[in-house]
């Protein structure tokens, strides 16, 4: 009874305020009150008032005509005027890849739906394209732009079911039959289905080329507001080396079993605000990525990030740091968020080949239920094959030559979780302890396994109850 009363009081004290997204909002300073660490604040992009409609440039929106050229002409025309809004009226638009330009807002009206063609031949990468690792073009991309946005109440669909490999074990019989009817290849062991690849390409080669739905590379002043992003070939929303990014009131979703279908990934980004957003997807929900190895270290940390008033349903992690952390993670606040039915609630993962340091990370007022795995996990056991081989043979790892994970200075407070396989799991390694992590006012109930810790030190447990008992360090 005491546990129940404490949980109710904590919910009342820290209750979520799911603020309504204000269309065209320019001032986001109110989200930064009472921060546990000072964060550099975001500011909305500046978009001129000039407007055009894609219909004026020949877009049909009939779901049959390929409207890529009309969208490109509209964007180019607005760019020539110094920027403005490209309006997409209600309709169903079939598209190949489109590229945003500086000072442009792509605005989707109610009932405007963008479907991106599954024809891989449309997505061949531009010569010398940066940050793509040889992958095909994303459905919507921007490179080195300033002041860009995608806004409105429309829907953007990547038709990822024509791109993603499928595990038989994750499909019902009817789902499996539907995929096979699309045309493609089932592996000899019957465990995987690969979509049909372009002529002359091996069936599994397309898997290495599929790209993100939205990929924004080295851009400044970015706003995504109100739009639904779904069914991506790979990651859904992926700002990469960007600064001053706002995601306000967006929805990101895919089938629960979609391969590598991360919801939101921030790769080495600075000054980011994610608010009033819902994610329900097949891989990590909202994820911080700091790059791997030397390239990640050179790119610098993910820093000055505020995630507030967000909901995550199915995902591998509600909020995730890693596994790529080499650039580091600094000044990150997650507040007033709900995770329901995720595999893991708060997930911190890395390994010896991709580690980096966390600094000033705060997760506060987090409410979870029906967590399939761990409510909270820190793990340093993501390793590549070479490192795993060396560890298995007892080789002494030279910490100066590998990128050791360093999960420290993380503060988790005011958490309520009902239902989890494991309450809290800390899994370090001899070369990299989990250390100096604080848990305050954490209540986890109905966890099959309460608490487990190895290679961890400096752990503070203040008013922490798992299944009504204090965990033993």
Predicted regions: what they are:
Residues 110-111, 146-154, 220-230, 243-255, ...:
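Right-handed parallel beta-helix
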Residues 92, 241-243, 251, 290-292, ...:
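Active-site-proximal loop/turn and secondary-structure-junction residues that shape catalytic pockets
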Residues 98-107, 240, 327, 355-356:
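Short, surface-exposed basic-aromatic patches at helix termini and helix-loop junctions that form
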Residues 206-208, 216, 239, 266, ...:
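Residue-level marker of regulatory loop/turn positions in helix-turn-helix DNA-binding domains and
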Residues 60-62, 293-297, 327-328:
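Short, small-residue-enriched loops and turns at beta-alpha junctions
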Residues 83, 94-98, 117-118, 159-163, ...:
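Short glycine/acidic-rich loop motifs that flank beta-strands on beta-rich extracellular proteins
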Residues 325, 345-473:
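Extracellular beta-rich repeat passengers
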Residues 2-87, 92-105, 109-218, 223-225, ...:
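Extracellular "leader-to-stem" segments immediately downstream of a signal peptide or signal-anchor
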